[in-house]
């Protein structure tokens, strides 16, 4: 089975570090994954949100609301996902984002990952389940979106458990956030793996927010600064491309 795995690079999953940097004060990225629990129509849903490690950055909440909906079933509901408590470790961990970064841990651009989990019992199988969360707001340091600090942050994951009742979602193989230096060569692998061995298709999309702010969410593309889009997240002398496989 082929799965479409949309990479939400959004212009907020990439922090460009120049000699002068801006500190992030809002959300820097996120993703949603799921895995079957072994109980029919029951899935463990994980939400990961990323924020700047800087102490002045806005703190993320201890819970997030997850909407799960199916248009074909005319069904929508919300559940609360709690932040994961890890024994002998802080709830959120500041990490140095990769080995090809410009500076040491604790420098601008380092990221804090918050993981939330909730078990969702779907009422029945459907080809169009959507797991989604909407919150506010995006990183004020983003330069490719207009008014990023006032823009909502919507992420979605889509499940067809009619085709695959015990389906696993793709999972990023590496940390879903990176930073790099202007003018330096950079290689960034944001590939993913799938426990079911399904083939994956990658694509770039626009950054989104919800236009209705209620479950089920209605996705709306955010306005980009002239010259940028989901397909053109960075200015480059060579066009940005992605290998769909």
Model-derived regions: residue spans:
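Bacterial Sec-dependent N-terminal signal peptides
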Residues: 1-28
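Long, compositionally biased, intrinsically disordered segments
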Residues: 22-245
